[in-house]
Swiss-Prot record:
Keyword annotations from UniProtKB, A to Z: Aminoacyl-tRNA synthetase, ATP-binding, Cytoplasm, Ligase, Nucleotide-binding, Protein biosynthesis
Full protein name: Proline--tRNA ligase
Species of provenance: Prochlorococcus marinus (strain NATL1A)
Location(s), subcellular: Cytoplasm
Gene Ontology cellular-component terms listed: cytosol
Broad enzyme group: ligase
Protein task: Catalyzes the attachment of proline to tRNA(Pro) in a two-step reaction: proline is first activated by ATP to form Pro-AMP and then transferred to the acceptor end of tRNA(Pro). As ProRS can inadvertently accommodate and process non-cognate amino acids such as alanine and cysteine, to avoid such errors it has two additional distinct editing activities against alanine. One activity is designated as 'pretransfer' editing and involves the tRNA(Pro)-independent hydrolysis of activated Ala-AMP.
Amino acid sequence: MRVSRLMLNTLRDVPSEADIISHQLLVRGGYIKRITGGIYAYMPLLWKVLKKITSIVEEELSTKGCLQTLLPQLQPSEIWERSGRWKSYTQGEGIMFSLKDRQGKELGLGPTHEEVITQIISQTIHSYKQLPINIFQIQTKFRDEIRPRFGLMRSREFIMKDAYSFHANENDLQSTYSDMRNAYQNIFTKCGLDFVCVDADSGAIGGAASQEFMVTAESGEDLILISSDGKYGANQEKAVSIIEEGNLLEPNKPSIIKTPNQKTIDELCNYNDFHPSQIVKVLAYLATCDDNKKYPVLVSIRGDQEINDIKLSNKISQELKKNVLDIRIIYNEDMQKQGITNIPFGFIGPDLSDNLLAQSKGWEKKFIRIADNSAKDLKSFICGNNIKDEHKIFYNWNLINTVQLICDIRKAKPGDRCIHDKTQKLEECRGIEIGHIFQLGTKYSKSLNATFTNEKGIEDHLWMGCYGIGISRLAQAAVEQNHDDLGIIWPTSIAPFTVIIIIANIKNNDQKCLAEDIYQKLIQNRVDVLLDDRDDRAGIKFKDADLIGIPWRIVAGREASSGLVELHNRKTKTTELLDLNSVLKKLSEEFNTEKL
């Protein structure tokens, strides 16, 4: 390919809408063009990158016996309603684009394809003899992001590889899950990325277990917690840990103390010389579920800890057997709108009476009560007395007559001790999610009645796994991790071109002929090569080559008359003056191929 035919359009200035460096470089390098918020055109350079990533993915999955298919992007609402996800994906903060056809039937543009593939498999697979099976596709997905940003990192239209496996039993599912985890590690390694695999929350996809593959980068949206020895890692949404014991409050006779205007943990501690770890703080939440009902929730946690909203939402969903569409803290204004005026915020205890909800206009009439392990482990504590300006001291859970759901809803944080080894502590880094794998179990096969006949001749539900890779996001993540002040530094395996040849002076016949000779030889040897044949200054060509990030640069310049060219490595910034044969030998060694 010649630059004169490439439609290359680079920018020197940083685009105003691009917040992170990878987004800036992709726009400046002419890789993407913004059409509207969260929607981009993949220009020829990026399309070559995406095709190379796709090729690596397809090759690796084929070695695992996966079958490639292409599923419809438009999906009927009926199967999503059967799985229980239609409302959660189309209402509130749901991410599915939905529409109606001419007959008034509701459809959705697929953000994911669990329902569709499960329906297809249920109509196709009938016996254990046909299992296991693993099917994947690579296609454009759609998500109505609340706040699309960071270019391809969080866009409304993107390319994704999603795979779905079906099994006769849990052991077989776990075996394929392990195979796919290994395949992902191979894929990301071949793409030249530094990544970590961490435990993750299953989110709206659901299932028993899941892991994320994260490219480590300071601009990453996710906070990852990793043990010092590297044996444990998790997204903070999922992470578990051991907290410090804190300053224990020795048991004594329970009593009530006056605490005027001491609504916060800090105020309570400063006025009374308490420690936050001696306090049970209670927060009121409101959970909105897919049945359109609103459930008040009282959450108790140790005063020096934070609530993990994801864990809390999951616990409520599990308890109610309903999807939580939204969860948020209740404020005094919310209470007033419900006609409730006597809740003493800042002085609430775990035993706040349900009677206060009797007059509510649109909420359920009882609190769901949840206590984090950190609070439940306290034998003696301070908490609100449910009366303004009053707290209880030396209180204990035996004195509280309301039933609490006990679970882990605490946000693990850096410095916490690790579950697997108390001598290890959690350390933090930020990451960009590029892959996610799930053990779904029978979640979808039961809701969609996808069954098969097992070895005993009994009808049973299929076991299922799903596995996603963000292809377009991976491309930008590679840039976020591989760049310098001059531009992109593509890993060789996914670079749009492996080599760029620059003719320093297009009017110099020696330079032009030598460059053309090298160009043709590289093409003959199937090297992905770009020839910069523009009638432009050499400095402009060098800057463009650095910006677009081609791994190897050959310059036919002043020494061309002697048959010598400069061979420059974009990553190491080393330059050698070599003759044609030496260049070809050097590149063949670097590409680990037969002699060029």
